[in-house]
Amino acid sequence: MALAKQIMGASLMDQKTSVFGSNLCLNHVLVNKHRLRLRKTRKNGSMVVAAISEDLVKLXRVEKEKPVTFKVRAVLTVRNKNKEDFFKDTIFRKIDAITDQIGWNVVIQLFSNDIDPRTRAAKKSNEAVLKDWSKKSNVKTERVNYTADIMVDSDFGIPGAITISNKHQKEFFLETITIEGFACGPVHFPCNSWVQSTKDLPNPRIFFTNQPYLPDETPVGLKSLRYQELKDLRGDGTGVRKLSDRIYDYDVYNDLGNPDRGNDFVRPTLGGEKIPYPRRCRTGRVPSDTDITAESRVEKPFPLYVPRDEQFEESKANAFSTGRLRAVLHNLLPSMVTSISKKNDFKGFSQIDSLYSEGVFLKLGLQDDLLKKLPLPNLVTRLHESSQGGGLLKYDTPKILSKDKFAWLRDDEFARQTIAGVNPVSIEKLKVFPPVSQLDPEKHGPQESALREEHIVGFLDGRTVKQAIEEDKLFIIDYHDIYLPFLDRINALDGRKAYATRTIFYLNPSGTLKPVAIELSLPQALPGSESKRVLTPPSDATSNWMWQLAKAHXCSNDAGAHQLVHHFLRTHAAIEPFILAAHRQLSAMHPIYKLLDPHMRYTLEINQLARQNLINADGVIEACFTPGRYGMEISASAYKNWRFDLEGLPADLIRRGMAVPDPSKPHGLKLVMEDYPYASDGLMIWEAIQNWVKTYVNHYYPDSAQVCNDRELQAWYAESINVGHADLRHKDWWPTLAGADDLTSVLTTIIWLASAQHAALNFGQYPYGGYIPNRPPLMRRLLPDVNDPEYLSFHDDPQKYFLSALPSLLQSTKYMAVVDTLSTHSPDEEYIGERQQTDTWSGDAEIVEAFYAFSAEIQRIEKEIEKRNSDTSLKNRCGAGVLPYELLAPSSGPGATCRGVPNSISI
């Protein structure tokens, strides 16, 4: 559906800018020049000045000498595939090599910044054909340069655009074009795009030079091309998208369920008045057979649509496929074995450890004789035999085990991970005690917490609770209101048991945290019945195991909220509308598009993969996390409280009470907890991004009125809100876009979310969560009450009870395999402070220089983070058995490194 037009009406860009006004101005100037031109004649030794009539001016223009032509050379850099599919690639490549010789070529044409006064259209070169395509068709290098000789008139001016028609059968990936031979020097066209065959996309592709232009500064010869390119990218909101398409449009999340498989696979539509949610990329697929409001499913290995240039490049796709292969193998074997065996629980912690040392085969007791009896695909057995020691089927040892195998058991490590782990964004300063729920008491029972002063006062170093709050010593992670409305349904699921948890922490004099109470809440069964219980640090063996179970439930709550709310909703889903709107409303020559471009890479592709495999009905999130089929409803419930104006790091820290404004402090903030690794490192990166964006914005918008008058920019921001976040479009907290400072703030927030915030929340998933007891994604048992029949089994063998409460073997291995893949950097990762074609991405030398300064600042920050991780006074990141905090260290190599800040949400 044409959702954008339904909500927004016609785009601002749909108001065509006529070139006639500019041509008339040009003609007026020419006539004036002719009027002022004096013809000197000598007659009888004196100079006679003759006036020139309008007719003579016109005649002079007609008789103007025809310009001569000269030749310039185009060099096109095309990237080859490393591995070709025989039928898709090899055969078509050979066909293209043959047909290229008979005229089915790649044709290019240059367009000038200037217009031809006679045609009132851009000056154009002759069409030219790429040379030697057939000769170079078998070249195996990663990149191949093709050339073309182009004839242009001497008055052509400066080239501003180039069109390409690919008359071959096969698409090709075009990295750059350089034009040589003009007096102005080499002209660069950064492309980084798939050029489709004209049989798929008949219109020629348009590429612009690296010179950025605001809309009202667009050279007159490029205006119609600028409009046409955006029109092509918007589409008309109808039809089923093909994988070769380049169209960006919006839709709701109506493709997570599969009603055609039965009621168990029905999921509500996310997005709309009933369940608000951000919009996703439209595919146009037909409805399901049984529910016209649900889009039909496309299951792996078949891909969902995203615009062609959003799809993974080859090295990224290969790395992701390898990770998925490992995940498939890790999932396949346990599922086969558990299908023939009822032994589905871990028998001891040593069995969990064996997943890393022995691999999946030995962990499952699959010796060679038993292995041969299982109905495994030949591929699996061959991989096992060929991989050295079965390495492909082993799990890497998570970093949480690398320094101290038993760190996860300690209270101080449980607390440390709330500020230096994979989810450091839930903790808040405790402001009210006891905590109070904001839920409707008619539906969810009393709002009062069961926490009392007597529960925690003994752990406050002689302070009262009131004193501890006033001295900023108490903190809380509160999941009560997020989970409680869903608990009845969650706990009715087979093998799922959950509480709505609150955990209170006390700040020690050393700067570390310790948990002092955990509240576990269930829905009230009957009015007046007890539904809450409070646990405090243990004093004996029995209370120790109860405390460990309570911590596990708190971690399970945290794992779900982290994945569904902070990770997917607040980064992946919330950013997608801004990306869609950028492609639809900002020309590739717009300076703000050039700024955002590296921060949009791969996000649409990874989000469609999430819809297909992770957040869908019976997908990984439902299978591995406590909320099960209700997980995305929890995510949508949190969206009602999402606020873009509070998503920047300083605003978020202030909102959570973790910092207060202080102009005298670095970054203008004073952290309430000085040794808060995520916040202290994050503020350095935030400030670097902010300074870079401010320099960039002020360069192109020296006058704030230019921001208001930039029709593309305003259309982008308006569409992001009114269409992409349509369900919250009437909120009064949306920032205005009325000047350079507003624009700097909006862009800094978007870049922060896409880069550092996502990195902090994503790349620690396996290093911390790969050891299931440290961070169980789901729980299968509640804490036993003394009067419960199962209390005796807990009392007799608490370790067995604890392990039976954790995810099963199958659930654990599936989760471990997936988060291992999701925590991995690909070889082509582009990190903050880097970008493709560093020297030529922009034709503005001052901006290129400013980017190098930004890169240097990022490198300085990396060294500062290394220094902090060696500072023994910072006990939350340095100490015996303590993992250094590197999730915001900017650079990384490939793999699950627990560090590295990519430019974009690329995994």
UniProtKB/Swiss-Prot annotation:
GO terms for cellular component: chloroplast. Keywords: Chloroplast, Dioxygenase, Fatty acid biosynthesis, Fatty acid metabolism, Iron, Lipid biosynthesis, Lipid metabolism, Metal-binding, Oxidoreductase, Oxylipin biosynthesis, Plastid, Transit peptide. The keyword Nucleus does not apply. It is found in: Plastid, Chloroplast. Disulfide bonds: none annotated. Its cofactor is Fe cation. Belongs to the lipoxygenase family. This is Lipoxygenase 1, chloroplastic. It comes from Tanacetum cinerariifolium.
